[in-house]
Design a protein with these regions (language model features):
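Phosphate-ester processing/binding pockets and catalytic centers
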Residues: 1-168
Length: 168
């Protein structure tokens, strides 16, 4: 079975209200047999640098952990440049070692809302993403499971639960 982890970048907020220009929905596909080894390696990195295998890694946290960014706020902040370089190297090597297929859908929200003013770009991106995941599954002859990041950032996800049943 293939696991398809879906997360977004951007938001569904109108540009006139300070929203981002693009909404990007990306899914990363891994084989289920690789899940535990991936988790084990990542937890080891977290333990090595933060003595906490459960600490949350987010790209913003890691980027702002850089001691050369004094205004960068991060629960992962490192004050030693050498240590940060080692973290970057370990994370880069870790990410390069993962067998993954990524699928991304990018929506230019201004153009999208010109054509579909009453539609939610997240819904459209999600449908397109699932279509491509289904094509991938057919191509490799496998079943799959979709895992959506449940945290709400700047994308309204409160409606997603009931709405996804309609999409599937």
């Amino acid at each position: 079975m293939k696991l398809f982890y879906v997360d977004e970048s951007g938001d569904t907020i109108p540009l006139s209200q300070g929203g981002k220009k693009f909404l990007v929905l990306t899914g990363s596909i891994i084989d289920e047999t690789n899940f535990l080894p991936i988790e084990k390696k990542l937890r080891a990195i977290k333990q090595k640098y933060y003595n906490d295998p459960d600490i949350e890694f987010k790209s913003n946290f890691i980027r702002n952990a850089n001691p050369d960014i004094p205004d960068g706020k991060s629960p992962l902040k490192l004050h030693d440049r050498q240590k940060y370089n080692e973290l970057e190297t370990d994370l880069t090597d870790f990410l390069k070692s993962i067998e993954v297929t990524n699928i991304s859908i990018v929506i230019d929200k201004a153009e999208f809302w010109k054509k579909y003013p009453s539609q939610n770009p997240y819904d459209t991106a999600y449908v397109f993403l699932l279509e491509r995941f289904n094509l991938y599954l057919q191509e490799v002859g496998c079943l799959g499971m979709v895992i959506i990041d449940p945290r709400e950032g700047r994308v309204e996800k409160a409606f997603v639960g009931d709405h996804l049943r309609d999409i599937h």
